[in-house]
UniProtKB/Swiss-Prot annotation:
One of its GO terms (cellular component) is host cell cytoplasm. Inhibits post-transcriptional processing of cellular pre-mRNA, by binding and inhibiting two cellular proteins that are required for the 3'-end processing of cellular pre-mRNAs: the 30 kDa cleavage and polyadenylation specificity factor/CPSF4 and the poly(A)-binding protein 2/PABPN1. In turn, unprocessed 3' end pre-mRNAs accumulate in the host nucleus and are no longer exported to the cytoplasm. Cellular protein synthesis is thereby shut off very early after virus infection. GO terms for biological process: symbiont-mediated suppression of host cytoplasmic pattern recognition receptor signaling pathway via inhibition of RIG-I activity; symbiont-mediated suppression of host gene expression; symbiont-mediated suppression of host mRNA processing; symbiont-mediated suppression of host PKR/eIFalpha signaling; symbiont-mediated suppression of host type I interferon-mediated signaling pathway. This is Non-structural protein 1. Residues 1-73 are annotated as: RNA-binding and homodimerization. Pfam families: Flu_NS1. It is found in: Host nucleus; Host cytoplasm. Upon interferon induction, ISGylated via host HERC5; this results in the impairment of NS1 interaction with RNA targets due to its inability to form homodimers and to interact with host EIF2AK2/PKR. It comes from Influenza A virus (strain A/Chicken/Scotland/1959 H5N1). Its main location: host cell.
């Protein structure tokens, strides 16, 4: 096993522990707590994949961080912080919408890279909007936290979420996954639109009908993909 993979996991475990202690003091805001929950799932998945104990890794990560801090001057820390672009956390969904359980009458699931796409194929002839919570850096989507598809009545009928065991994805991965979800929902004569915020930062554009600028060939490909897997 690569040593960098192990040490990265150890540091992530310790930093999560620090953030959890911060949250336990009721100091974290909603985006902070949301990321904390999802990072916990990710760490569990990585720990299982690597065969590493989280508690042991946390202790090792503490030693690594302490060693770095001992060598770090205040001036170097200021320069490092100034050189890193700041990311922003954007929310289409409330915490209730993100944490709500939902069920599928005709479940369909597809994995695209490090993203899991789920949808209810029993949904037909509905107006659906895609909402997402995600981080943005340099005016481009950086990390998808969660995307869900809602009917006008507020029911959840689809979802795109990162796989805890496969962290890391690009904005192109997210756009491709959205294309798959749209293709699957439209196959049953649903009308799908994407939130203006998501259009703006994923595609850097927006359409009045809420449709992202998917090329016709890509849309046909997405529809065929869903059809072949039914």
């Amino acid at each position: 096993m690569d040593s960098n993979t192990v040490s990265s996991f150890q540091v992530d475990c310790f930093l999560w522990h620090v953030r959890k202690r911060f949250a336990d003091q009721e100091l974290g805001d909603a985006p902070f707590l949301d990321r904390l929950r999802r990072d916990q799932k990710s760490l569990r998945g990585r720990g299982s994949t690597l065969g590493l104990d989280i508690e042991t890794a946390t202790r090792a990560g503490k030693q690594i961080v302490e060693r770095i801090l001992e060598e770090e001057s205040d001036e170097a820390l200021k320069m490092t912080i100034a050189s890193v672009p700041a990311s922003r956390y954007l929310t289409d969904m409330t915490l209730e919408e993100m944490s709500r359980d939902w069920f599928m009458l005709m479940p369909k699931q597809k994995v695209a890279g490090s993203l899991c796409i789920r949808m209810d194929q029993a949904i037909m002839d509905k107006n659906i909007i895609l909402k997402a919570n995600f981080s943005v850096i340099s005016d481009r989507l950086e990390t998808l936290i969660l995307l869900r598809a809602f009917t006008e009545e507020g029911a959840i009928v689809g979802e795109i979420s990162p796989l805890p065991s496969l962290p890391g994805h690009t904005d192109e991965d997210v756009k491709n996954a959205i294309g798959v979800l749209i293709g699957g929902l439209e196959w049953n004569d649903n009308t799908v639109r994407v939130s203006e915020t998501l259009q703006r930062f994923a595609w850097r554009s927006s359409n009045e009908d809420g449709r992202p600028p998917l090329p016709p060939k890509q849309k046909r490909k997405m529809a065929r993909t869903i059809e072949s897997e039914v």
